[in-house]
Amino acid sequence: MTRAFYIGRFQPYHFGHHAVIARIAEEVDELVIGIGSAQKSHEAIDPFTAGERVLMVYNALEHLSIRHYVVPIEDVRYNSIWVHHVVSRTPRFDVVYSNNPLVIQLFREAGFCVKESPLYVRERYSGTEIRRRMIEGEKWEHLVPKPVAEVIKSFDGVSRLKNVSTSDSNFSL
């Protein structure tokens, strides 16, 4: 049995992530999905909480054909211990999928088999672009699985993102 690990911030989870996970699912028996930077939320580039992101991923993958685990993973201060940190918080895994150069480097140095996951139409499916659309009031729902849009709407995530993205430079005491 082969169990893989794939990590992302999922701010928000989108069809690019969905395509990569579907491809990984064709190659392995189980998948551990790490919610990276789990401690971050309520910021312009990280507006959603770990719990909200877990729900997005869980709901989007309801029909995934393989067993999967969704695990929040907080950042650590030192990259040299990050892999150990990940391993201590997840079920054991045999292979890592990533396209992030730092993640690839750290896991290879730790002796893991690493496979690069191709980006899926990155210019269209990127968290940065989706958040920009949300802030600007443009259509974004077609870039994420329907269950993800439903989760974001359930806690008024677009309003939160707009609020945390507003500059306070005009504020004075």
UniProtKB/Swiss-Prot annotation:
Keyword Cytoplasm listed: yes
Parts of the chain that traverse the membrane: none
EC number per UniProt: 2.7.7.1
Pathway(s) this gene product operates in, as recorded in its UniProt entry: Cofactor biosynthesis; NAD(+) biosynthesis; NAD(+) from nicotinamide D-ribonucleotide: step 1/1
GO cellular component: cytoplasm
Subcellular location: Cytoplasm
Entry keyword set: ATP-binding, Cytoplasm, NAD, Nucleotide-binding, Nucleotidyltransferase, Pyridine nucleotide biosynthesis, Transferase
InterPro entries documented for this protein: Cyt_trans-like, NMN_Atrans_arc, Rossmann-like_a/b/a_fold
Gene Ontology terms for molecular function: ATP binding; nicotinamide-nucleotide adenylyltransferase activity
Record's catalysed reaction(s): beta-nicotinamide D-ribonucleotide + ATP + H(+) = diphosphate + NAD(+)
The keyword Endoplasmic reticulum belongs to this UniProt entry's keyword annotation: no
Chief localization: cytoplasm
GO annotation terms (biological process): NAD biosynthetic process
Sequence similarity: Belongs to the archaeal NMN adenylyltransferase family.
PANTHER family: BIFUNCTIONAL NMN ADENYLYLTRANSFERASE_NUDIX HYDROLASE (PTHR21342:SF0), PHOSPHOPANTETHEINE ADENYLYLTRANSFERASE (PTHR21342)
NCBIfam families (alphabetical): arch_NMN_Atrans (TIGR01527), cyt_tran_rel (TIGR00125), PRK01153.1 (NF002243)
Protein name according to UniProt: Nicotinamide-nucleotide adenylyltransferase
Annotated source species: Methanosarcina mazei (strain ATCC BAA-159 / DSM 3647 / Goe1 / Go1 / JCM 11833 / OCM 88) (Methanosarcina frisia)
Upper taxonomic lineage: Archaea, Methanobacteriati, Methanobacteriota, Stenosarchaea group, Methanomicrobia
